[in-house]
């Protein structure tokens, strides 16, 4: 959520930033109009309350002097009714303002490129060279079924489209990837490992920006009023919701693996085969809490943490800056990492790393103190995929496939695969 003072002091800037996202800047005028009404109501209410205090003294004085106080008692009642009415009006305006403010996205950083869609994202780095095959490479969805690493048909029978059973060495590879990623982040990148709740309440979803605007993308357990998480970013970021982080704690760096659940509303017909776009998938997440002046350097560091995984696995990738028309709701700046997939003959997103500045912290009321005597300030929050496990799985299977139908295990993963160096079709 944005600071109301930005609307008061820099309305032109806020309008231009909103317009860059393709949204209607008139919302700024709506907020300013409601803010003016609110301030007038507060002023009028304060005057009434001051008069009520004075009338209360007059009533007491008249009673002490045994004088008739009927007129001031009547005024007191009228004032009470008027104050109640003003408070009701103020509450209504507050609700309207909050309802609008919570749907306005974060302000985009000045160095984010302008554009309308992912076609306008800007490549800033490329690592590795896509492999040239001496044979016709297969898509990962064909490879995993031939090697009995996955079963899409039985998953569809049990749960519907966009689900998968990972079986045999497929399940082992998924687990190995999660263990490898978590181990690297905790032992080399300085993150604290967390196991997170995978059902959260509405306040938690509000804190990170999924609610109220993106409810259609979520799965909800109606009876309990809980939501399945679309990413571990949600519970990790809300760890400090409604808290003041004490001096000396920041920077705080969390990492956690979780299942992620997404309805994929609006993605009909896209990536319908394989592991790229499922309703349920595993992901290793990184979340950071930073002092405001440190958050931009933290974004660069977190992005290199994700890149280190891809490089150690030997997977060609590129880094792009998301343009103004493609960046997420809560982010001020986002880097996407895209891994090379031979089946697409293209790069596909495997990680997003974002600086959300104080946007989520204001929604979730996450503050910190620089020292014990200092006034609490809003922290900056960052999040990044480190990495999407299913997409990493797909990238390994495709990039490390062999002509004889086997898949070579990347060297970095061998210890996490029990020493296994290759996946072959099971005998049975």
Swiss-Prot record:
Its EC number is 6.1.1.11. Pathway: Aminoacyl-tRNA biosynthesis; selenocysteinyl-tRNA(Sec) biosynthesis; L-seryl-tRNA(Sec) from L-serine and tRNA(Sec): step 1/1. The keyword ATP-binding applies. This is Serine--tRNA ligase. L-serine binds at residues 231-233, 285, 385. It is an enzyme of class 6 (ligase). It comes from Staphylococcus aureus (strain MW2). Catalyzes the attachment of serine to tRNA(Ser). Is also able to aminoacylate tRNA(Sec) with serine, to form the misacylated tRNA L-seryl-tRNA(Sec), which will be further converted into selenocysteinyl-tRNA(Sec). It catalyses: tRNA(Ser) + L-serine + ATP = L-seryl-tRNA(Ser) + AMP + diphosphate + H(+); tRNA(Sec) + L-serine + ATP = L-seryl-tRNA(Sec) + AMP + diphosphate + H(+). Its main location: cytoplasm. The lineage of its organism: Bacteria, Bacillati, Bacillota, Bacilli, Bacillales. Homodimer. The tRNA molecule binds across the dimer. InterPro entries: aa-tRNA-synt_IIb (IPR002314), aa-tRNA-synth_II (IPR006195), aa-tRNA-synth_II/BPL/LPL (IPR045864), Ser-tRNA-ligase_type_1 (IPR002317), Ser-tRNA-synth_1_N (IPR015866), SerRS_1_N_sf (IPR042103), SerRS_core (IPR033729), tRNA-bd_arm (IPR010978).
């Amino acid at each position: 959520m944005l600071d109301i003072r930005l609307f008061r002091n820099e309305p032109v800037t806020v309008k231009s930033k909103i317009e860059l996202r393709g949204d209607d800047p008139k919302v700024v005028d709506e907020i300013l109009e409601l803010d003016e009404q609110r301030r007038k109501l507060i002023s009028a209410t304060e005057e009434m309350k001051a008069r009520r205090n004075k009338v209360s003294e007059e009533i007491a004085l008249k009673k002490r002097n045994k004088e008739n106080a009927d007129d001031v008692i009547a005024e007191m009642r009228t004032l009470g009714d008027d104050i109640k009415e003003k408070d009701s009006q103020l509450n209504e305006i507050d609700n309207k303002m909050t309802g609008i403010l919570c749907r306005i996205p974060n302000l985009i950083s000045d160095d984010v490129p302008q554009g309308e869609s992912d076609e306008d994202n800007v490549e800033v780095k490329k690592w590795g060279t896509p492999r040239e095959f001496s044979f016709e490479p297969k898509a990962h969805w064909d490879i995993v079924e031939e090697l009995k690493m996955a079963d899409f048909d039985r998953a569809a029978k049990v749960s519907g489209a966009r689900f998968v059973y990972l079986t045999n060495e497929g399940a082992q590879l998924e687990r190995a990837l999660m263990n490898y990623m978590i181990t690297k982040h905790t032992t080399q990148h300085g993150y604290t490992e967390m196991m997170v709740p995978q059902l959260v309440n509405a306040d938690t979803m509000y804190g990170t920006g999924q609610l109220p605007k993106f409810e259609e993308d979520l799965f909800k357990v109606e009876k309990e009023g809980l939501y399945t998480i679309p990413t571990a970013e949600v519970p990790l970021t809300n760890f400090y919701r409604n808290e003041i982080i004490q001096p000396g704690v920041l920077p705080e760096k969390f990492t956690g693996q979780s299942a992620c659940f997404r309805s994929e509303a609006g993605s009909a017909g896209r990536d319908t085969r394989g592991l790229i776009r499922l309703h349920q998938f595993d992901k290793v997440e990184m979340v950071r809490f930073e002092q405001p002046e440190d958050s931009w350097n933290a974004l660069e560091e977190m992005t290199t943490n994700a890149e280190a995984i891809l490089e150690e696995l030997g997977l060609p990738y590129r880094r792009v800056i998301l343009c103004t028309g493609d960046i997420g709701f809560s982010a001020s700046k986002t880097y996407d990492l895209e891994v090379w997939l031979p089946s697409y003959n293209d790069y596909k997103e495997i990680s997003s790393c974002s600086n959300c500045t104080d946007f989520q912290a204001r929604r979730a009321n996450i503050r910190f103190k620089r020292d014990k005597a200092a006034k609490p300030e809003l922290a900056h929050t960052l999040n990044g995929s480190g990495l999407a496990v299913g997409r990493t799985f797909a990238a390994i299977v495709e990039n490390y496939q062999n002509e004889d139908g086997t898949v070579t295990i990347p060297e970095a993963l061998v210890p996490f695969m029990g020493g296994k160096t290759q996946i072959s079709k099971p005998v049975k």
